[in-house]
């Protein structure tokens, strides 16, 4: 094997050397083209397979942009070819988007229903072709309905009868659909989605009418009985209208409350009721107005109105005058035949007279305005009633304290004056856009509120505070009295103790004097007196104290003062 490869290489080298430059260039070009072909083939085969959304190219740019925009809303990536063919990633996505486009009337009018459903036409016998068409329609419509997000499963039966000889004997095409919604689906109560399934069937089967389509759910409830939905739609419309009226009433209520509560306070403005009548029926109004013609405009520099306005302007005027004089002659019929001239004119025949006739014709031009409008809704009569409480003032005595009688504070009610009520009524009328032509009604009343429970709570709180203040005052007075008694007792005790100590000191001093006198007398008499150790120490201590008092009188005075303060 190796020798053969070696010989092959030698032969190729030898042959390559023998070739001319042109032959070498041709070989290199062929090899390059082959490599490029392989690369293009691999790239093309690696691309994902796209499924056409509609087999018919869409040339209308506006319709194509609407379809692309709807696909983008569903997060579906689509490509558009140069001829206008829209493609998506897979068949399942294509079926789901076809259903959405059919439901929302985004399929172009010139698109063949067969192109939408991608049903092939079979060119065999008529019987086989009809069977294949029916089977293809059933399968395709079933797949499209299953592709919907709200549908778990579906069964479709379409009956296409044989062609009859006479149109009166021709039976209609019928279709029955059984859908099995998903557990969280609301398709059974959404009319728009059911209508989308009906459009799907009508596009799939030419000649199929709405009255011949029956769509039921797993409970055998007919879903496309739109006549039965009329009552529900009417109730839903009434509910929306009532919500609209309630929202408008809430806006007016907030406006009126904000206006009055800023003046009288939140607690004095209550019982606000607003009723707005609104005609929500759709009406077409046509109005023709004949307006005067302004010949000269008003000069803004003058303080008065110098404009000139006329009802009309003469555009064409014609005057004709006829004068006739002579014998009147009424022609009869042929000779021997009585004429058909009335008797009144016969009496005027063959008379001589003078007749003048003047005819004036004028064509007046007027200004005309025509207005055609659809009026809905129309705000009707507005009724507002609000109650404003007067002012309650607490009575005080000459000392500025509240007057309390039988456990309650006496109060005085001051009503709102009639002039102030008129001003408040005018303010409310301006706030709601009062119109006497609509027979609007605004009532601002001054009815005294029942504040019994409120006053009871307020009086109870006031009396409780007063009682607490009295208790605190008496407690403080009691504490002050106790402290005063204690201080008096302390002063008296100190005074008694001081006097007792003075008596003891005086007694000791007298005893000391008597003892010293006895010693002195004994010394004078020459007697030998012996002293005890305690007496000797007391004498030494007294001498030391006396000596210190003589040497340091200030220190001794400070020491005595400290003893007195401690006592």
UniProtKB/Swiss-Prot annotation:
Function: The M ring may be actively involved in energy transduction.
Gene Ontology MF terms in the entry: cytoskeletal motor activity
A GO BP annotation: bacterial-type flagellum-dependent cell motility
Subcellular location: Cell inner membrane; Bacterial flagellum basal body
Transmembrane segments: 26-46, 469-489
One Pfam family matching this protein: YscJ_FliF
Keyword check for Cell membrane: yes
Residues forming coiled coils: none
Family, similarity comment: Belongs to the FliF family.
GO CC terms: bacterial-type flagellum basal body, MS ring; plasma membrane
Keyword Oxidoreductase: no
Main location: membrane
Full protein name: Flagellar M-ring protein
Organism of derivation: Treponema pallidum (strain Nichols)
Gene: fliF
Subunit structure: The basal body constitutes a major portion of the flagellar organelle and consists of five rings (E,L,P,S, and M) mounted on a central rod. The M ring is integral to the inner membrane of the cell and may be connected to the flagellar rod via the S ring. The S (supramembrane ring) lies just distal to the M ring. The L and P rings lie in the outer membrane and the periplasmic space, respectively.
Membrane topology: Multi-pass membrane protein
Residue numbers spanned by region Disordered: 320-339
InterPro entries reported for this sequence: AMP-bd_C_sf, Flag_M-ring_C, FlgMring_FliF, FliF_N_dom, YscJ/FliF
Keyword vocabulary terms for this entry: Bacterial flagellum, Cell inner membrane, Cell membrane, Membrane, Transmembrane, Transmembrane helix
């Amino acid at each position: 094997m190796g020798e053969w490869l070696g010989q092959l290489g030698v032969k190729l080298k030898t042959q390559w050397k023998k070739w001319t430059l042109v032959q070498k260039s041709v070989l290199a070009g062929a090899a390059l083209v082959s490599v490029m072909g392989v690369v293009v083939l691999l790239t093309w085969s690696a691309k994902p397979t796209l499924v056409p959304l509609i087999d018919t190219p869409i040339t209308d740019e506006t319709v194509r942009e609407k379809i692309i925009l709807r696909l983008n809303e569903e997060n579906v990536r689509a490509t558009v070819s140069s001829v206008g063919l829209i493609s998506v990633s897979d068949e399942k996505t294509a079926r789901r988007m076809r259903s959405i486009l059919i439901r929302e009337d985004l399929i172009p009018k010139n698109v063949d229903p067969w192109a939408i459903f991608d049903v092939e036409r079979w060119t065999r016998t008529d019987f086989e072709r009809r069977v294949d068409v029916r089977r293809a329609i059933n399968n395709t419509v079933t797949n499209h309905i299953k592709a919907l997000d709200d549908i778990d499963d579906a069964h479709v039966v379409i009956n296409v009868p044989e062609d009859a000889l006479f149109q009166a004997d021709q039976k209609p095409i019928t279709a029955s659909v059984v859908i099995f919604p998903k557990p969280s689906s609301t398709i059974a109560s959404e009319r728009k989605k059911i209508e989308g399934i009906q459009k799907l069937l009508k596009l799939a089967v030419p000649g199929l009418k709405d009255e011949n389509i029956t769509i039921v759910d797993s409970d055998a409830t007919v879903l496309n009985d739109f006549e039965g939905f009329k009552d529900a739609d009417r109730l839903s419309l009434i509910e929306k209208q009532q919500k609209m009226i309630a929202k408008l009433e809430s806006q007016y209520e907030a406006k009126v409350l904000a206006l009055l509560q800023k003046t009288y306070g939140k607690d004095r403005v209550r019982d606000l009721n607003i009723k707005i009548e609104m005609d929500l029926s759709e009406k077409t109004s046509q109005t023709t107005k004949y307006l005067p013609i302004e010949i000269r405009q008003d000069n803004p520099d003058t303080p008065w109105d110098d404009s000139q306005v006329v009802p009309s302007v003469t555009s064409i005027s014609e005057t004709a005058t006829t004068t006739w004089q002579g014998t009147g002659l009424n022609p009869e019929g042929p000779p021997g035949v009585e004429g058909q001239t009335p008797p009144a004119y016969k009496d005027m025949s063959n008379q001589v007279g003078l007749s003048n006739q003047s005819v004036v014709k004028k064509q007046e031009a007027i200004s005309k305005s025509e207005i055609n409008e659809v009026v809905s809704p129309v705000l009707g009569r507005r009724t507002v009633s609000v109650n404003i409480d007067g002012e309650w003032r607490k009575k005080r005595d000459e000392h500025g304290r509240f007057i309390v009688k039988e456990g309650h504070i006496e109060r005085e009610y001051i009503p709102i004056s009639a002039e102030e009520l008129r001003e408040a009524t005018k303010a409310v009328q301006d706030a709601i856009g009062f119109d006497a032509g609509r027979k609007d009604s605004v009532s601002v009343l001054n009815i005294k509120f029942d504040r019994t429970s409120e006053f009871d709570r307020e009086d109870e709180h006031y009396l409780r505070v007063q009682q607490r203040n009295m208790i605190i005052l008496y407690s403080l007075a009691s504490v002050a009295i106790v402290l005063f008694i204690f201080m008096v007792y302390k002063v008296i005790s100190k005074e008694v103790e001081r006097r007792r100590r003075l008596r003891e000191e005086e007694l000791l001093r007298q005893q000391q004097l008597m003892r010293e006198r006895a010693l002195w007398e004994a010394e004078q008499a020459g007697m030998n007196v012996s002293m005890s150790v305690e007496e000797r120490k007391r004498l030494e201590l007294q001498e030391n104290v006396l000596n210190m008092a003589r040497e340091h009188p200030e220190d001794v005075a400070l020491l005595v003062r400290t003893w007195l303060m401690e006592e």
